[in-house]
From Swiss-Prot:
An annotated Gene Ontology molecular function: ethanolamine ammonia-lyase activity
The protein's name: Ethanolamine ammonia-lyase small subunit
Chain positions covered by the region annotation Disordered: 15-43
Name of the gene: eutC
Keyword Lyase: yes
Length: 298
């Protein structure tokens, strides 16, 4: 079926629907003239930083009918919309952005929180039974238990029997800790103290999993344990932090349903300062109800 037959079918269908039939465009009279192609809404550039705000706002749909609608849609979500297609395939810039975001997510899982950064924050650092990142990824069970050195350090250097114990751990996203720390921990500790609660010594657990907070709470006699841990990164979002709070945790009896989780803490989700206020209120309600997770009443 050639182009002329396709145009005839289109005209006959539109005529049967009572719509105006588009007139065929007359070919150029100049010998050797090439058909002109309308300019796309955005040009692809190899020099563009694929992680920049400009790259994220890029619209790859060529010749849109309502460009303003696409612009508004692009501003309203971080999802991969309005990227356009090249036949059945994604456009080059959309594909490169996808690959760049995937690489960034892998990097943040494999990166380490620098020891210098931990010291600069004035945090006590302890470890789980894990000794390196590779074992952390392959042996999650060992990331749920403190090393003997960590147990000794916590017993000797931390406040015992606090109302609330705050713990920071790298988890699966180093960037989540380093990017959000300054905006969540100071207001969180200040809010807990203003509420009249006895706050334990905050410390950093390297290679920690969520369940490690059960052993910490039992060891220190904490009523509520709040664990701030890096979330598993998504494509292009490597700075998302989670808070796992649990009341009176015990290694042998606490289950996942006993935890209350606040996730997606970062500048593009729940702002860290706002999350700090929510966590303070959550800790107060846990102490009032003496419960957490599904056992709490709303």
């Amino acid at each position: 079926m050639d182009q002329k037959q396709i145009e005839e079918i289109v005209r006959s269908v539109m005529a049967s629907m009572g719509q105006d039939v588009p007139q065929p465009v007359a070919p150029s009279t100049q010998e050797g003239a090439k058909p002109q192609r309308a300019a796309p809404t955005a040009t692809e550039s190899c020099a563009l930083d694929l992680g920049s705000a400009e790259a994220k706002a890029w619209i790859g749909v060529e010749n849109p009918h309502r460009a303003d609608v696409l612009t508004e849609l692009r501003r309203s979500t971080a999802a991969r919309v309005c990227t356009g297609r090249a036949g059945p395939r994604p456009r080059t810039q959309a594909l490169l952005r996808f690959l760049a975001d995937h690489s960034r997510s892998k990097d943040t899982v494999l990166k380490e929180v620098p020891e210098e950064w931990v010291k600069a924050q004035g945090l006590l650092e302890v470890r789980s039974e894990i000794s390196d990142k590779n074992r952390y990824l392959t042996r999650p069970d060992m990331g749920r238990r403190l090393s003997q050195e960590a147990i000794d350090a916590l017993k000797s250097q931390c406040v015992m029997n606090p109302d609330v114990q705050v713990v920071i751990s790298d988890g699966l996203s180093t960037d989540a800790i380093t990017a959000n720390y300054e905006e969540i921990l100071p207001p969180l500790l200040a809010g807990l103290k203003q509420a009249g609660l006895k706050v334990g010594t905050p410390f950093f657990v390297r290679y920690g999993r969520v369940k490690i907070e059960d052993q910490i709470g039992e060891l220190l006699g904490a009523k509520v344990v709040i664990l701030l841990v890096g979330e598993r990164p998504g494509l292009g979002q490597s700075e998302s932090l989670s808070c796992y709070a649990v009341y009176s945790p015990r290694v042998t009896t606490t289950v996942e349903a006993d935890r209350t989780c606040i996730s997606n803490i970062h500048q593009g989700g729940t702002p860290p300062v706002e999350a700090a206020a929510v966590i303070v209120d959550l800790a107060k309600r846990m102490l009032e109800q003496k419960a957490s997770g599904i056992n709490m009443t709303r």
